[in-house]
Amino acid sequence: MLQPSPPHYSSSRDVRHHHHHHHHHHHLALSSKARVFPLSLPCNFSSRVSFKLQLHCAASSSSSVSPPRCSKPNPSSRKRKYGGVIPSILRSLDSSTDIETTLASLCLNLSPKEQTVLLKEQTRWERVLRVFRFFQSHQSYVPNVIHYNIVLRALGRAGKWDELRLCWIEMAHNGVLPTNNTYGMLVDVYGKAGLVKEALLWIKHMGQRMHFPDEVTMATVVRVFKNSGEFDRADRFFKGWCAGKVDLDLDSIDDFPKNGSAQSPVNLKQFLSMELFKVGARNPIEKSLHFASGSDSSPRKPRLTSTFNTLIDLYGKAGRLNDAANLFSEMLKSGVPIDTVTFNTMIHTCGTHGHLSEAESLLKKMEEKGISPDTKTYNILLSLHADAGDIEAALEYYRKIRKVGLFPDTVTHRAVLHILCQRKMVAEVEAVIAEMDRNSIRIDEHSVPVIMQMYVNEGLVVQAKALFERFQLDCVLSSTTLAAVIDVYAEKGLWVEAETVFYGKRNMSGQRNDVLEYNVMIKAYGKAKLHEKALSLFKGMKNQGTWPDECTYNSLFQMLAGVDLVDEAQRILAEMLDSGCKPGCKTYAAMIASYVRLGLLSDAVDLYEAMEKTGVKPNEVVYGSLINGFAESGMVEEAIQYFRMMEEHGVQSNHIVLTSLIKAYSKVGCLEEARRVYDKMKDSEGGPDVAASNSMLSLCADLGIVSEAESIFNALREKGTCDVISFATMMYLYKGMGMLDEAIEVAEEMRESGLLSDCTSFNQVMACYAADGQLSECCELFHEMLVERKLLLDWGTFKTLFTLLKKGGVPSEAVSQLQTAYNEAKPLATPAITATLFSAMGLYAYALESCQELTSGEIPREHFAYNAVIYTYSASGDIDMALKAYMRMQEKGLEPDIVTQAYLVGIYGKAGMVEGVKRVHSRLTFGELEPSQSLFKAVRDAYVSANRQDLADVVKKEMSIAFEAERECSSRSGEEEEDDEEENSEEDEAF
């Protein structure tokens, strides 16, 4: 009985999991002829190795199996017609799990060729190995290299490197020498697994046995180099082979690829560089008659079509179109047969380098030579035209596949669906899906998230759900695809739909969610600001048997830090460290930024120091947050200190950091220092950004340096990067310097640039117009803001409106009354203010719109509301409506106040009702009404309107008596100065 493999030859993955599963295998005896080295791979694998088999089988049975996705699949090798007993044996093996018993029951004496067929027809590595061991168990069996090649290939394709290594050692001790085919096959399977250096070590071993690679092996090495992006090395190897040399240049290749073969206890590179050569040296080196040795350095030329195809693809991917074309021409000249793959490769090479017409002409040449295009040919042309933006041509090639008698394959449908989905062509996508349904073709699993994303982006969430549910009826999606589907919903904030998909897996199939699905679901909750749900999901992960990874911790931590939930973030960070996961720089950066936003600079500094202690190097984002935080707080010395530390640590400062530094200097008015930093930014690639320029503009504006500010502003203009802050700062500067014409020019430019988009920007321009006395233009702008843009007004807006009311001649008592109504948030205060303002500016249509809002329901029993209605109707010339409003006011029990009397006397004057004016005048004269300049002025203006200038002059004299000339003068002057100061401060504050 064979001995089990020693523990040190089992893979690290088996060591971690061997205690979970047990598997029974048949015990087979080997003949004396088939000598097996004690360390060879036995048929009764150790529990560690058997776990792999069991795990593999379990995974295959539980995971989704991609259904056939084209109406006419390519025939498999099982469709080949074999003579004799082979077909019946294959059928028996297919229907049996007990391979050994089945083979033994047939009692057949198979020839080596028939044995080869049975080995090749097995689809799983375990079955290949069991059939092989059965053959070895017969005394008549003679080991041969072809059988070992089949077994080694099966193990390599399955990534069973430990088993392959043991099989190789067994092969050597059975005296079976590898051939060129063996080496070529090993290079191929290792290369396809991404183990480039390990693959090439087989060629080195080949050289030690004095074998020289044949053309097939050479082409395999070239393909490995090509697929790993090592185009120059591939070219050197090919040319070296032609000259009779082998040029591998192993030292320049990374020792361990990204998939980490170095992680296992006995890693592949160590095996290939030590154990492998040791085994090879134990046997006498024999030169095979079938292979040329390295001493034969006669020039060689490739002769196989497959070799030329590989080389053409190599030069195409390397961008060496001339070399690819020369090889194609050489094939034509030297008589090397050209096949469909050759043309496909040339078409792809030409098309991907922008030569679509040449690609099209190659298709015609292909047909002229009698070489039929296959589905892949049309797939290539379809993708090329789609990439070029010619969707109609791409779809034409899709339709042509069936026209010429071919069948679209998985790649075809995936490509056409992705193309249409990217361009949001919903109807066309559904037409393709309908055609696939008619031909009983299922949608490829990888296309499901793409189609769903198109639906969701177009607001067709119901259709997206229907597609997902339909696909799930007969197919279990992989975790990767499920995560992609959840992410489609997450990106649009559709957390309920994402949640349904997430929990649906557990409810429908009883499977636990993968960590990737948890990570995306946490992202979905984060996007929807449902942080409690995200935390709850995270806390329940372990109970469901899924452990968080670094991505889980980092995502959750950054989500919490992003919304300044620092306490929860700290707890996650502590748990992350306890679990052995190392937070990345982005994680620390998010937390430091959160502390800075909250003004917790000392906590930010503590975390920065902890970050350095754990060996995580701070990046420019970390330093930028700290520098900006100190700059905003006016702590210039600390900001500069961290800037110097950043330079000492060799971290390149970006524009954000330098802008923060300028901001710090601006806070304390250090112009020269700010200039130095700004000049440094000018010398950098792309120059200063708009944020840095705005910081410098602000500093110049505060210091009143017009020329330098204009220079910076003009530079922004030339680059087309002026933003709202740039324009506002320049308006503030010009207005502060009394340069109102220039301020208005900037305001006009800002308006034309389309940057008037929010309340703040409108306020800035309106304040500028108000300061320049362009009251009507200011009101037009306000109407655009209020009615057309429907922006929410803020206190800055109303400050400007009250300034306009004062400048528009509205009685000061009326302005105060409206301002009080606004401050007290009285109902309908805003339409009362706007109606009064538009009336004062002569914009009666706008005024009546606002008045309609006041009168559409019950007018509030407030003086400000009735006064606004009376004033609006009076100003627009509708005397009857104004008087009706006054009468309704009295009916409501509201006595007229000074504002009402002023508006009422104006109505009398416009209507020519002199007696009415006289009544108010009389009450004012005899003290029945409180003396008011506004009311005296209203009476005087009413007499003028009624063509009684004589009475207007009388009122003027009475005003002189009531308000002594000197007091009137000083008071008026003081009020004007106070008003001007108030207006100026209000206008300035709007900036």
Curated annotation (Swiss-Prot):
Instruction: Indicate, by first and last residue, each region the UniProt record lists as having compositional bias (Basic residues).
Output: 15-27
Which residues lie in Low complexity bias regions? 61-73
Q: Is Kinase among this UniProt entry's keywords?
A: no
Q: Does the record's keyword annotation contain Ribosomal protein?
A: no
Where do the TM regions start and end?
A: none
For bias type Basic and acidic residues, the affected ranges are 965-974
Region (Disordered) location:
1-27, 61-81, 965-991
The cross-references to PROSITE patterns, in alphabetical order and at most eight, read: PPR
UniProt keywords (A-Z) are: Repeat
Which segments of the protein form a coiled coil according to its record?
none
The record's PPR repeats, renumbered to this chain, cover: 144-178, 179-213, 214-248, 304-338, 339-373, 374-408, 409-443, 444-474, 478-513, 514-548, 549-583, 584-618, 619-653, 654-688, 689-719, 723-757, 758-792, 862-896, 897-931
Feature: compositional bias, Acidic residues: 975-991
Q: Name one Pfam family in it.
A: PPR_2
Family stated for the protein in its record: Belongs to the PPR family. P subfamily.
Q: Which NCBIfam families match?
A: PPR (TIGR00756)
The name this protein goes by in its record? Pentatricopeptide repeat-containing protein At1g73710
Q: Which organism is it from?
A: Arabidopsis thaliana (Mouse-ear cress)
The taxonomic lineage of its organism, from the top, reads:
Eukaryota, Viridiplantae, Streptophyta, Embryophyta, Tracheophyta
